[in-house]
């Protein structure tokens, strides 16, 4: 038995945070003993393992590792035995149990949690962006967006912006109203980043009438007037032609379907919709 300061080497194909957390939690169970932890992240090959174990052997360190690639795990175990080093495989046993329980094969993809974290934060950023630059609140968002949605009121610009945000796409949207000139920023972005949205006037009339009813207002307001709607749609189409952007008629389409068409345009560069 010895009270010498134990040394734990953390070896990981990612950041090594999982193994470090477990190691510190275990070390905390021993009061009065300080544990030295050396973390080596992004280990991808056998040569790197050789170098680490050679150093670890000088301190008779404990090896705690999270390596998802089975070949590297097996190699590390064999080399550690050669150096008479004790090892703890933090991920391997649980991966095997899950595979046995589900009958599925694991992907053995290193650093996958980091990839998922990046996707999550990209989505959060996109949602915050969509809220900040909704309904033309700040035209500067037009220049920062991955896609800019334009159209008259009630053509689903906001719900589409939020749907795209959940896909990690930063979407700004600009309402087109005959009495209000669109921001100059709209004409400064590449036309392929702008999507025009339109609806058949009959459907738009129904949607706006229902909106007024929900708000407790009469349907005789200009907002739901058929002639006014036709005027707005013609004005909007003129702006879209000036921008040179693709136009999607969302009549009869679910949000998911329209969003899918937007993504196709963005990624395939389609012009005619």
Curated annotation (Swiss-Prot):
ADP binds at residues 151-158. It catalyses: N(tele)-phospho-L-histidyl/L-threonyl-[pyruvate, phosphate dikinase] + ADP = N(tele)-phospho-L-histidyl/O-phospho-L-threonyl-[pyruvate, phosphate dikinase] + AMP + H(+); N(tele)-phospho-L-histidyl/O-phospho-L-threonyl-[pyruvate, phosphate dikinase] + phosphate + H(+) = N(tele)-phospho-L-histidyl/L-threonyl-[pyruvate, phosphate dikinase] + diphosphate. Its EC number is 2.7.11.32, 2.7.4.27. Pfam families: Kinase-PPPase. The keyword Disulfide bond does not apply. This is Putative pyruvate, phosphate dikinase regulatory protein. It comes from the Bacteria. The keyword Chaperone does not apply. Belongs to the pyruvate, phosphate/water dikinase regulatory protein family. PDRP subfamily. InterPro entries: Kinase-pyrophosphorylase (IPR005177), PPDK_reg (IPR026565). It is an enzyme of class 2 (transferase). One of its GO terms (molecular function) is protein serine/threonine kinase activity. Bifunctional serine/threonine kinase and phosphorylase involved in the regulation of the pyruvate, phosphate dikinase (PPDK) by catalyzing its phosphorylation/dephosphorylation. Keywords: Kinase, Nucleotide-binding, Serine/threonine-protein kinase, Transferase.
